[in-house]
Amino acid sequence: MLLLRTEVSYNDPPAAKPLIRNLIMKKLSKVQEKQQALVLTVADKLEAQAREEIPGMMLCWFDVEYHLFPGSLILFFQFEDEQSLEAAKPELLKWQKRLSAAMLKKGVILKDMRKHLTFTLQGPED
């Protein structure tokens, strides 16, 4: 299982993001690199929007098995505490739709949008 988890944050300086990502990723094929770039672009965009709109949202990270892409893609919005997580749960469907729309704009169809984004308290290392 090829597992990609990134701790690169929206707050990191833009010049540092590629360096951090290169340190924590395994060697990928050219096709997988394109898939990864697409997912990172969408994840960064959604993370920026979510930080502005959802109180307590800390980090967006993802998990994917490239040989099963896009079916295996799952984005996680990590929250500071249980209270902010519970307050954000009514917004989950809206963010799942945003992910689906953003991926569709990039030419990737997510068949069941509800499986590809979740809210959590766990981080990438948990």
Roles of regions detected by a PLM:
Residues 53-57, 110-113:
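Short helix-terminating capping/connector loops at secondary-structure junctions
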Residues 19-45:
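N-terminal presequence-like segments and adjacent domain-start helices
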Residues 35-50, 85-110:
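Short, non-transmembrane amphipathic alpha-helical segments
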Residues 55-78:
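Short edge beta-strands and adjacent turn/loop segments
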Residues 79-85:
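Short beta-strand-loop-alpha-helix junction that forms the active-site gateway
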Residues 100-126:
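A short amphipathic beta-strand at an alpha->beta junction
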Residues 4-24:
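Short, Lys/Arg-enriched N-terminal segments with co-localized hydrophobic residues
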